[in-house]
Amino acid sequence: MTRKQRVFVTGASSELMLQVLAKVDTERFDITGLTRSKNALDYNGIRWLEGDIQNSEQYLKFVVESDIIIHAAAITHSKTQKDYFDVNHEGTRKLISCISKEKKPLFVFISSRVAGEESGAYGVSKLRAEEEVKKLKKWVVIRPSEVYGGTKSEGIEKTIHDAINGGVQLCPAGVESKMYPIHISDTVDVIFEAAFEKIKENQTIVLNGSVGYSFKELLLMIERVSGRKITIVLIPRWFLGLVGIVSKLLPMDIGFVPDQVARLYSKKTYTEAAKTTVELESYIGEIVKRQNEG
């Protein structure tokens, strides 16, 4: 009987990774998923490990035995730079330090299209994590663009749902790099292929959609598809910077963190589009159709 390949997944309870794991043949793969909280998680064939990426003692034995590691755990929004580097960079380094030198597993790292020196603390922390990953024998780095189609109202998904009913919409002015949004199902397919179908190793995949939008172009497209008037209010960079400073001082969450300004205005990579099965305009059209039918 062929031994199952052992797979260790961080950030396993995220919507993205749950969809990846749903595609895996658990007759062939023995999967352990690391999660901050395993409440209400019930996926057949998956061993859930409650723990923290920063505490390697909690998951050491599973990493040592692994043939494949998918690292998706990350912090994306924080008021302090230290949080980004503790989780995204140092957490990745601690995970890698657990790997057996004899086993040499495939390491698939879910990074970000904004990874870079000019992309604020988040972007730099992801870039430093990538550098750690690329020291390994077998690795794939995946840099997703803006992902839509999930159930959480955040990022571009929040922008879509805020704008789809029309009204006044705030729009950052002067952002040069366009968004190239990609549907969650297409993102899932690429991650699955990288980990379980053994695509070319030791490569960085910039994962983006085929159509680019500035923030203003996105709002105008939503207006056209929805048929609802949108009043666009341009917000200059200096004002966003001020909001970032204020957000750091306030004790409550205002939905904006200091490093988002640098992240927003940084130059981002773009490559030939991945296979796209759901275009953004069609996706928005379906939302509008459901609203009208409801």
Q: What residue ranges belong to the model's regions?
A:
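A conserved pocket-lining segment of Rossmann-fold NAD(P)-dependent short-chain dehydrogenase/reductase
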Residues: 161-182, 190, 194, 206
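Glycine-rich "substrate-gating" loop/helix at the edge of Rossmann-like oxidoreductase active sites
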Residues: 145-152, 173-184, 208-211
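NAD(P)H-binding glycine-rich loop region in Rossmannoid oxidoreductase-like domains
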Residues: 40-42, 46-93, 98-101, 113-117
